[in-house]
A protein has these predicted regions:
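A short alpha-helix-loop-beta-strand transition element characteristic
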Residues: 2, 68-73, 102, 245-253
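FAD-binding core/adjacent interface of flavoenzyme oxidoreductases
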Residues: 1-78, 155, 166
């Protein structure tokens, strides 16, 4: 079933839900992910579009539809954040908007994809340049208005007209997590043991963006989908082990490489001794994505959608 969590009573071991009866638990997994912080810059809450949830994607899709159906010569888009989401989104939107698109990618640091392998970073820079995406590096967003964005570069303020601002920067934990009486770090993430259990609450497990986890070697676990996917396997095992009096396994993160989509028929990947970009990397990334689908039903639905989508797009033109 689906419901919104309003609170957790750890003493009575109850999960409180909005408009639903509360649920009791013997073991609890906290995997609420994170939220996009839009309160960092004046105007962002009102005028910037986050890009994290399915609801966010639908809102963005509707805004793009309106812009594409308008009489405007150009569609001006500013994407805040030169991380993975920002770069992939910039490439995809550049393909979608074509000659009408005027895209700029805004990054406060001196390079995009700061934690990415050099090969992937260079492939991304090449793709962005080929698609005409303007890079604003070492640039801070000062404020956002309905039709403009103010940027600071080397102490100089510049206001630029825009039709759409997309915010991909930062992560904050859900409000319900902050209300829990658990040990948390400065970002509000729940600190866990290497077995992914909440400190002083062995019946509760936490993983993903809301967890501050160190693995069996004491290394900080990155806040990536790849890490969360691996944590899920360990969590499932450890729940079973805790219920059957078997030893729990400390989490051991395995970095399997990195893949990024860079628009239509283009991607980059590194890992397991392989470095690949272009259409071959795009195909490899899609196959890996399909393989990672949780069930055969998901694989069939996604694969079928990939096959028929180009046909539908062609017929609708």
């Amino acid at each position: 079933s689906q419901a919104v969590v309003s609170g957790i009573d750890t003493k009575k071991q109850l999960v409180q839900l909005q408009d639903h009866p509360e649920i009791s638990y013997d073991r609890l997994v906290l995997a609420l992910g994170g939220e996009t912080p839009l309160d960092m810059v004046p105007g962002a809450t009102s005028y910037a579009y986050p890009f994290r949830t399915v609801t966010d994607a639908h809102r963005l899709q509707e805004r793009l539809r309106i812009l594409e159906q308008s009489d405007a010569d150009k569609i001006r888009v500013a994407i805040v954040g030169g991380g993975y989401s920002g770069v992939e989104l910039a490439c995809k939107l550049a393909d979608r908007l074509g000659e009408r698109g005027r895209l700029r990618l805004i990054e406060i640091g001196d390079q995009i994809l700061r934690t990415s392998p050099e090969f992937n970073r260079e492939a991304a820079k090449k793709a962005l340049a080929a698609k005409g995406v303007f890079l604003d590096l070492e640039t801070k967003v000062e404020s956002i208005k309905q039709d403009s964005i103010s940027l600071e570069y080397k102490n100089q303020l510049d206001t630029i007209p825009v039709d759409l601002v997309i915010w991909t920067v930062g992560t904050k934990v859900a409000p319900v997590v902050k209300t829990l009486n658990f040990k948390q770090n400065q970002r509000g993430q729940i600190i866990t043991t290497p077995t992914l259990q909440v400190l002083d609450h062995s019946e509760i497990f936490a993983l993903g963006d809301l967890a501050d986890c160190r693995d069996a070697e004491g290394q900080q676990v990155p806040a990536t989908a790849q890490a969360a996917f691996q944590q899920a396997d360990y969590t499932a095992w450890n729940i079973w082990a805790s219920l059957t009096n078997r030893p729990l396994l400390p989490f051991r993160y395995q970095h399997l490489g990195e893949m990024m989509a860079l628009g239509q028929d283009n991607a980059t990947l590194t890992g397991l001794g392989i470095k690949l970009d272009g259409s071959l990397a795009y195909l490899a990334r899609r196959l890996a994505y399909l393989y990672r689908m949780p069930t055969y039903e998901h694989q069939l639905k996604v694969g079928f959608n990939w096959l028929v989508r180009p046909i539908i797009d062609t017929l609708s033109r």
